A protein has these predicted regions:
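Flexible loop/turn segments at secondary-structure boundaries
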Residues: 42-43, 183-184, 206, 229-231, ...
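Hydrophobic/aromatic anchor residues within beta-strands of the central parallel beta-sheet
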Residues: 142, 233, 367, 415, ...
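Cap/lid segment of the alpha/beta-hydrolase catalytic domain
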Residues: 337-462, 466-469, 474-477, 502-511
Length: 612
């Protein structure tokens, strides 16, 4: 599962895109790891035995993920069709002898209706727990399916967008986390015997995540910023008693309790990186966990509570799987993405520096900066700059591996990766500063960043915008509302009009997005004022657009309408559409077509010689 080619320049984006990535999905009671591996072009299931032996389990037509079924040699596979996100759940028996990995024909449908979503939430002995919008296409229910009989039981049908669900130890109750009417807020309820009891206030502007039952079923454990700026770890009883276990005045915390309830793995979010520590069940600190790099981790406990499987990505770690010994706090590499990289490539990858940039209104904008190894600014020559803008908006830029960013740096560009207002990871106040009619303040942050780029050797007259999803919207907003400021833009699956986006996105998505951007029936005029397409006559910089034809979040029409308008005005715009993709590019063959073209577009417009 590896390829080696010596002395490849960092600017070779194709080689960077071909570095295979690992991610962990589950671990069973024998220590076998169910992993995702994209060496074949899309993420497929691979089993890593306790002795390190690798077995390829699937070779589906598109990406997939999965979990082990408890006490069985089988997995439940989650898969969709060409990125449409209508996920289906199938069973794959591992004791059946096959010639090679399984295709779709080898899967036994467990939950199947291609018109709707079935999102895998959890596995319990004999059961799979999932959420689905099949009842009306809008509201999500929580359902269990008996793995032996196929019988399905609806545990929650109270409406709304269900973000997560946790089945109680008795199996009679389910704790449901739904998005509430407030932006970036959730409500937690307990559903039992057809009734729903609130645990948190639906009117509270607070985010509650990672809800898990205590092993004895007497309460819940969660991460929450209820009446707080940053999320802490709290134990909540059904009678409304809250007991804070771990708190921080500077960082959001997440919690992953061990299956036996004895230990808590606490994740601290620290300026785009995650720090780990083990605490006891009352929140007392036991030990810190040493990681091989400052990056971002995913977490899955072993059933015996003695180990944790971690996925790690960092600027110089494309995607590794680690095994954490809870008794020592030591995390050892199980499989490494670097084994599939050309010789010397990992050593050339660039670490970012961290900065705070003053905004026009006195706020400060956190950002990372990736600078070329041979910095021309040291000799008094300012270089081209790309702003890489994250999606969401209720997300954050993090310290992770991005092959396109690394290739930009290798081509001689400085890359600024900001967390403008509205980003998570820096407290409730910061992520609330772009809500509703504050949207234009977030766009104004782009100009503050542009004025600042000379501080890191950048030329403010040679800055391009690059972003996906909400980041793509920011690209279009900057190019149309601040047309004097930008040399070029790359928009990936971005919204060109908040009005047509809300009108055409699926109903379940509209309810989710209106709480952030504004409601069509009462705020249409403001939504028009915040839409890039309203100012299209001001656009002067060339634009490069990438979109998946099956995008269920931001419809392809958002890119098609801006392409048509620019063509009609005789302005430069290239649109690449991929018929087998959705909200982003999941297939390596498509990434190899789109991203080198986007990089060539940028280095040409920013006056940087195209790498040989």
């Amino acid at each position: 599962m590896s390829k080696h080619r010596a002395d490849v320049p960092l600017s070779d984006v194709r080689t960077l895109l071909e570095v295979p990535l690992w991610e962990p999905f589950d671990i069973d009671d024998e220590g076998r790891i169910l992993a995702g591996y994209d060496g074949g072009g899309t993420t497929q299931l691979v089993e890593i035995a306790a002795d390190g032996q690798l077995t390829e389990l699937t070779a589906l037509s598109g990406r997939c993920s999965g979990r082990y079924l408890v006490a069985e040699r089988a997995v439940v596979v989650q898969h969709d069709l060409n990125g449409n996100e209508n996920t289906q759940l199938s069973r794959l028996d591992l004791d059946v002898e096959r010639v090679g990995p399984a295709s779709e024909h080898d899967l036994d449908p467990l939950v199947y209706d291609p018109e709707f979503m079935h999102n895998l939430v959890d596995v319990q002995p004999g059961l799979v727990v999932f959420t689905t919008n099949r009842r009306n296409g809008v509201d999500f229910d929580v359902v269990t399916v008996d793995c032996a009989t196929g019988q399905q039981t609806t545990m929650y049908a109270g409406g709304g967008y269900v973000a997560d669900a946790s089945l109680s130890p008795s199996g009679r109750e389910v704790a449901v986390t739904c998005l509430s009417a407030q932006p970036c807020s959730t409500q937690v309820t307990i559903s039992v015997d057809g009734g729903v009891a609130p645990i948190t206030d639906p009117a509270d502007h607070a985010l509650h995540t990672g809800v898990a039952w205590l092993p004895d079923g007497t309460g819940l454990l969660m991460s929450s910023n209820h009446q707080r700026e940053f999320r802490g770890i709290v134990r909540v009883r059904p009678d409304g008693t809250w007991a804070w276990l771990v708190e921080s005045d500077e960082h959001d915390l997440d919690v992953y309790p061990s299956p036996d309830g004895v230990a808590l793995l606490v994740v601290r979010h620290d300026d785009g990186a995650t720090r780990l520590a083990i605490h006891d069940d009352d929140g007392r600190h036991v030990r810190d966990v040493e990681l091989p790099a400052d990056g971002v981790v995913s977490v899955r406990w072993a059933p015996r509570s003695d180990r944790v499987v971690l996925g790690l990505t960092a600027p110089r770690v494309p995607g590794d799987i680690l095994a954490l010994d809870v008794s020592t706090g030591t995390a050892d590499v199980v499989v490494s993405s670097s084994s599939g990289a050309p010789d010397g490539m990992i050593d050339k990858l660039v670490e970012p520096t961290t900065h705070r940039v003053p905004a026009a209104d006195g706020e400060t904008i956190p950002c990372f900066v990736y600078r070329p190894p041979s910095d021309a600014a040291a000799e008094g020559v300012r270089g081209g700059v790309v702003f890489n803008l994250h999606g969401g908006p209720e997300e954050q830029a993090q310290r992770l591996f991005n092959p396109v960013v690394q290739a930009m740096v290798g081509a001689g560009l400085t890359v600024v990766v900001p967390n403008i207002r509205g980003s998570t990871g820096y407290g409730k106040r910061w992520y609330s500063l772009d809500d509703g009619r504050l949207r234009l303040d977030a766009i104004a942050d782009l100009l503050a960043l542009r004025e600042w780029v000379p501080e890191v050797g950048g030329d403010p007259e040679r800055v391009a915008l690059y972003g996906a999803s909400y980041g793509g919207y920011l690209v279009l907003a900057g190019l149309t509302m601040q047309s004097h400021a930008w040399r070029a833009g790359v928009d990936i699956v971005g919204m060109s009009s908040l009005v047509t986006f809300l009108e055409n996105t699926p109903e379940y998505r509209r309810a989710l997005r209106e709480r952030e951007y504004g409601y069509l029936d009462v705020e249409r005029q403001f939504l028009l004022a915040a839409s890039p397409i309203t100012y299209l006559e001001h656009l002067a910089a060339p634009l490069f657009v990438i979109h998946g034809a099956n995008d269920p979040r931001v419809p392809l029409s958002e890119s098609e309408q801006i392409k048509a308008a620019l063509d009609g005005a005789g302005l430069a715009c290239e649109l690449m559409v991929f018929d087998d993709e959705g909200h982003g590019l999941s297939r390596r063959e498509n990434r190899l077509e789109a991203y080198p073209a986007a990089l060539s577009f940028l280095v040409d417009r920013l006056g940087v010689p195209v790498p040989e």
